[in-house]
């Protein structure tokens, strides 16, 4: 035991080393040339440490490579899903055969595209066996005393409208017994056959004038339309008959004639073609004077009105050779004898009385074919269609006016074209009676660069627009898949969020890092970091259910806050600088928040409760007076929302971009604040001390020294905050109307790419066009964040290099440090 008072062992050891060594006489004297040898083991690292170090090194390297592989894996997956959207159509010629018997008539294909059939005014429909080339007759149920004199083919309904010599009309529906996949029906007919509707005369008294030379048919569900061209001694007559379903509680309703109409007197020439619409309220007639007539059914008067006459729709004296409906019966495809190909669609036309009337107008124009347009076949699932000239066939898509495929030159001249409803098979007949079969592979005609980013003139709209309306309530809905409204909404929401978040977060970080007392900073910074963990769904609910209703009528109060609070803070700061130094030194640095917090809260409460309301009505009156002087007219407004709607003519929604800016700002502020504060706190103290030694004030130090040095970190914080705002989903989904519109109006909503994916992806069919376009939106988000982060890293490295050089020149040398 050491003696008391000798001090700690280290001090005793130091004393013993400094005192002379006392040697006993018997001990040998050490050799002056012998030195103690170092022990090699003291410099060796334990094997377990080396083993653990190697494992951790490989683990970290492997983790880094895994992250890189994962990122590129996501990229490759998104590319694999979206690349098919930009691929064109593929049409391949299959077998070509000549039926064993002459097959004159009108050809059709069943929905599966595997069973061709033909009809030619007889009492049999012939189904073609593609393996043997034989025609199998299937009888048509017609009365023995009726003879068919005219027919046509409706590919959308897979039916033949027929007319008999006695002036009666009906429909022969054809079914092959196969489903769309070419398999035997599990439900419904399992064998090829026909169904014939009851025959009805085209006049009320049954006395039909002349012989029917043309017949057309449309089915609108509860209403069916027949139109015929009757050859009489006075010339062709155009007759129209409507059938409506009779309702009964005991049995299914039967279709009975409900109206007979003779439209001959309202024609400008002789009718040569007619197209009743499957909507049941429209009829298109082409005349020999090259005019296109549009008749519409008036529900009130129960009459057919001629609404429009289009003279020479192809222009330059070119005559129409084909007039056909596009799928949906909202657009007409017109072909001419010089190869012109145009689309006319229904859309509102302003009238003299201020009303708008839906009329046809030219919306699309295709490059001309190399000969007259002769034949036409339309898809039954989208706006694709086929047209042919004497030696070429072209596949087009009506919505985007794209040519999906075109044959270079056929070795035969098509006499007929037919396609199945699924539009994956086509047949063409030639002058020698041979039938040529083609397979069509065009899975995503609705997509493509023009549809996704270009302005498209959609049906029902009076001009080309960027629109996103991916799904509709009917099978013939025209999908609108422009991504521009979604990209615009993403940028709009991000902009309004950053306008609110960046000044608050950066200024708060500056104050916390260099002005706030350390004791308070130890509380504030963890609270802000905890705030970053708030679920976005909670913030979204807060914005939608609490903040949006309260902000709807408080916009003037918010404007007053934005102006008054910074002004009042600057005024108090100026007043503080005018006080004597002896008086200011009584308060510790960083305690300004004790004075400013109550003032800011009191100012915000005063603006919210009183000032906004006091200024709202005078502002409305002043605006009304100014707009009256400008001749903008008078309007009524009881609030700012009414002024915005009625006075400025812009929409004002409760859930709008202003709400998104505030709520998303709360999600972005903690991210920007935390990273910025770390960058500001890590500025070398030597720079700050040198600035203080030169007599700079705290604000001068922050403005001229701290902010430039920390600019790289602050810029990184802004970019990370930008990425957080770009990818936000739930806040935008809940706090806005989620409407895909392109409008910078701050009181309007928007839809972002991320919110659109979250909303629509669960309902999208796998591998459909809609499904792939949603993944394309994800690829755009991925690219946006990747590009932004890459640019941010480049800028950050340059800023860091620049100010590291400055630090190198201003830092003391090692000799100065000693």
What are these regions (language model features)?
Residues 480-494, 548-567, 586-671:
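Loop-to-helix entry region at the N-terminal start of transmembrane alpha-helices
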Residues 497-528, 572-578, 792-801:
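Transmembrane-helix boundary motif in ABC transporter permease subunits
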Residues 174-184, 242-251, 296-302, 345-354, ...:
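Short loop/turn segments immediately following beta-strands, especially the blade-tip
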Residues 517-525, 593-600, 689-716:
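Amphipathic cytosolic juxtamembrane alpha-helices at the membrane-cytosol interface
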Residues 571-582, 677, 681, 685, ...:
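C-terminal transmembrane helix and the adjacent membrane-cytosol boundary/short C-terminal tail
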Residues 673-675, 697-734:
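Transmembrane alpha-helices
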Residues 639, 643-650, 732-782:
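Interhelical loop and adjacent transmembrane-helix boundary motif
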Residues 809-818:
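Conserved small/polar residues in nucleotide/adenosyl-binding loops
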């Amino acid at each position: 035991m050491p003696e008391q008072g000798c001090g700690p062992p280290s001090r005793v050891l130091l004393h013993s080393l400094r005192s002379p060594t006392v040697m006993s006489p018997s001990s040998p004297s050490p050799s002056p040339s012998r030195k103690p040898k170092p022990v090699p083991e003291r410099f060796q690292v334990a094997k377990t440490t080396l083993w653990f170090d190697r494992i951790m090194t490989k683990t970290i390297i492997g983790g880094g490579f895994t992250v890189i592989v994962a990122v590129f894996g996501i990229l490759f997956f998104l590319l694999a899903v979206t690349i098919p959207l930009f691929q064109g159509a593929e049409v391949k010629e299959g077998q070509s055969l000549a039926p064993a018997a002459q097959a004159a008539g009108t050809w059709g294909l069943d929905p599966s595209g595997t069973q061709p059939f033909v009809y030619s005014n007889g009492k049999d429909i012939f189904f073609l066996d593609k393996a043997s080339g034989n025609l199998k007759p299937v009888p048509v149920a017609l009365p023995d005393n009726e003879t068919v004199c005219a027919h046509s083919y409706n590919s959308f309904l897979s039916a033949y409208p027929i007319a008999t010599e006695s002036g009666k009309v009906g429909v022969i529906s054809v079914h092959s017994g196969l489903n769309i996949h070419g398999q035997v029906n599990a439900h419904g007919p399992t064998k090829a056959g026909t169904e014939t509707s009851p025959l009805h005369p085209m006049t009320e008294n049954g006395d039909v004038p002349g012989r029917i030379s043309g017949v057309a048919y449309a089915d609108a569900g509860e209403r069916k339309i027949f139109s015929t061209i009757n050859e009489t001694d006075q010339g062709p007559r155009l007759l129209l008959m409507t059938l409506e379903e009779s309702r009964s509680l005991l049995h299914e309703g039967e279709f009975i004639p409900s109206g007979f109409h003779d439209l001959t007197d309202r024609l400008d020439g002789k009718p040569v073609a007619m197209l009743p619409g499957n909507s049941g309220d429209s009829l298109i007639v082409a005349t020999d004077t090259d005019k296109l007539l549009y008749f519409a059914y008036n529900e009130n008067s129960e009459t057919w009105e001629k609404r429009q006459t289009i003279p020479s729709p192809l222009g330059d004296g070119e005559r129409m050779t084909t007039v056909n409906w596009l799928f949906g019966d909202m657009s007409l495809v017109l072909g001419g004898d010089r190869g012109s190909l145009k689309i006319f669609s229904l859309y509102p036309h302003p009238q003299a009385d201020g009303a708008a009337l839906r009329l046809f107008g030219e919306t699309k124009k295709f490059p001309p074919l190399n000969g007259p347009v002769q034949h036409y076949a339309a898809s039954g699932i989208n706006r694709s269609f086929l047209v042919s000239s004497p030696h070429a066939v072209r596949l087009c898509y009506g919505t985007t006016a794209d040519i999906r495929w075109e044959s270079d030159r056929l070795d035969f001249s098509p006499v007929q074209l037919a396609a199945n409803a699924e539009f994956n098979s086509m047949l063409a007949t030639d002058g020698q009676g041979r039938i040529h079969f083609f397979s069509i592979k065009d899975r995503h005609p609705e997509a493509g660069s023009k549809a996704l980013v270009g302005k498209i003139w959609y049906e029902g709209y009076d001009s080309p627009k960027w629109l996103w309306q991916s799904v509709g309530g009917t099978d013939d809905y025209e999908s609108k898949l422009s991504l521009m409204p979604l990209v615009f909404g993403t940028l709009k929401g991000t902009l309004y969020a950053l306008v609110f978040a960046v000044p608050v977060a950066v200024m708060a970080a500056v104050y916390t890092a260099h002005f706030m007392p350390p004791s308070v900073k130890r509380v504030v910074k963890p609270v802000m970091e905890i705030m970053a963990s708030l679920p976005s769904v909670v913030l979204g609910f807060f914005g939608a259910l609490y903040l949006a209703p309260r902000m709807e009528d408080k916009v003037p109060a918010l404007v007053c806050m934005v102006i008054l609070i910074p002004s009042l803070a600057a005024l108090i700061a100026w007043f503080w600088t005018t006080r004597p130094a002896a008086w200011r030194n009584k308060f510790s640095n960083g305690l300004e928040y004790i004075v400013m917090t109550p003032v800011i809260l009191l100012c915000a409460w005063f603006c919210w409760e009183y000032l906004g309301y006091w200024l709202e009505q005078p502002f409305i009156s002043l605006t009304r007076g100014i707009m009256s002087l400008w001749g903008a007219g008078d309007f009524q407004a009881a609030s700012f929302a009414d002024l915005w709607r009625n006075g400025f003519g812009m929409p004002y929604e409760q859930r709008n971009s202003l709400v998104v800016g505030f709520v998303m700002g709360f999600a972005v502020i903690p991210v920007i604040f935390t990273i910025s504060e770390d960058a500001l706190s890590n500025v070398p103290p030597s720079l700050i001390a040198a600035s203080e030694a030169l007599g700079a004030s705290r604000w001068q130090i922050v403005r001229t020294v701290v902010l430039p040095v920390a600019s790289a970190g602050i810029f990184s914080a802004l970019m990370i905050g930008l990425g957080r705002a770009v990818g936000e989903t739930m806040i935008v989904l809940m706090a806005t109307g989620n409407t895909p519109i392109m409008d910078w109006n701050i009181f309007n909503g928007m839809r972002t790419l991320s919110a659109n994916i979250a909303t629509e992806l669960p309902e999208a069919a796998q591998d459909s066009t809609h499904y792939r376009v949603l993944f394309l939106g994800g690829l755009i988000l991925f690219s946006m964040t990747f590009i932004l982060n890459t640019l941010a890293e480049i800028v950050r490295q340059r800023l860091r290099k620049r100010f590291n050089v400055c630090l190198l020149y201003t830092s003391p040398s090692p000799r100065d440090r000693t």
